[in-house]
A protein has these predicted regions:
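Structural preference for beta-strand elements that scaffold enzyme active sites
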Residues: 18-20, 67-71, 110-114, 142-147, ...
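Short amphipathic alpha-helices and their capping/turn segments at secondary-structure boundaries
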Residues: 2-16, 56-64, 102, 130-136, ...
Length: 263
């Protein structure tokens, strides 16, 4: 089960590369059995909490001292900034996020812990993160930084909106990490759902795949310019932005080739 991760971490250590863990808790891709008891009924809060603790201890314990930081909780907010009513929320209550940070810190006290989410350039969601961070800090939860996902396109978001979020998060006293940075050159088929909700699964329409034979130079230049503008922004706030993580080795292997429609 751990063979691939073991090999990647060994490679990183041999080449003096820091490793970031993703992710300890996420509402997506959690097996249904986690929330059921041995009779197939809704599991008790105590049972779900025990499973969560065992999971965190198993994963973080295996790599204790070897993984620099972890996305402790991923995408726990709705687009309006309210807490997502996920199975984790329903099983453990609204304090479950603080619990994850506490359990993770116990498992590896030296690991940096982040809250990670997408569309944080939107004012409503940004406000939700600020409210969440304030609540976590009030509970003395060991949160180190805020992960601002970067699933962008050529025409969104506005750079000013990204900068406003960086400044707002910096003012909390936490560090900012730019995570999952990729920029799509393709038109987005559903403007109302721009972001990174992996549950979107739309039927392929060729009008949204205009560059099947290769990216025209003019569009490639636009893509280059967008990356340049973003990195200039990150450098302006290098006192707070500690890391930028690119989401994929190259554009040919990006997850966005198969989301929100496969093609």
């Amino acid at each position: 089960f751990f063979a691939a991760a073991d090999a990647m971490i060994a490679y990183a250590e041999a080449n003096n590369i820091k490793v970031i863990g993703h992710v300890l808790l996420w509402h997506e891709q959690t097996p249904d059995w986690v929330f059921l008891d041995d009779k197939g009924q809704t599991a008790s809060k105590e049972l779900v909490l025990s499973r969560l603790k065992n999971h965190i201890n198993a994963v973080m314990g295996r790599y204790k001292g070897r993984i620099h930081g972890w996305d402790a909780v991923n995408e726990a907010l709705n687009e309006d900034g309210t807490l997502r009513q996920s199975k984790w929320y329903k099983a453990l209550g609204e304090d479950y996020i603080a619990t994850v940070f506490e359990l993770a810190h116990q498992a590896d006290p030296k690991a940096q812990l982040y809250y990670n989410d997408f569309n944080l350039f939107k004012p409503e969601k940004r406000a939700g993160v600020l409210k969440l961070v304030a609540a976590l800090k009030a509970k003395n939860a060991p949160i180190y930084g805020i992960g601002e996902q970067g699933h962008y396109s050529l025409d969104y978001p506005k750079l000013q909106d990204v900068e406003d979020s960086i400044v707002a998060f910096k003012n909390t006293g936490l560090k900012v990490v730019i995570t999952e940075l990729d920029i799509s050159a393709l038109p987005f088929p559903d403007p109302e759902n721009i972001g990174a909700d992996i549950s979107l699964n739309m039927k392929l329409k060729q009008e949204f795949n205009p560059y099947a034979d290769g990216l025209p130079k003019a569009v490639s230049d636009q893509l280059t310019q967008k990356y340049l503008q973003l990195f200039e922004l990150f450098l302006r706030h290098s006192d707070a932005v500690e890391r930028v993580t690119l989401w994929g080795v190259n554009d040919n292997q990006t997850w966005r080739n198969n989301w929100p429609m496969k093609g």
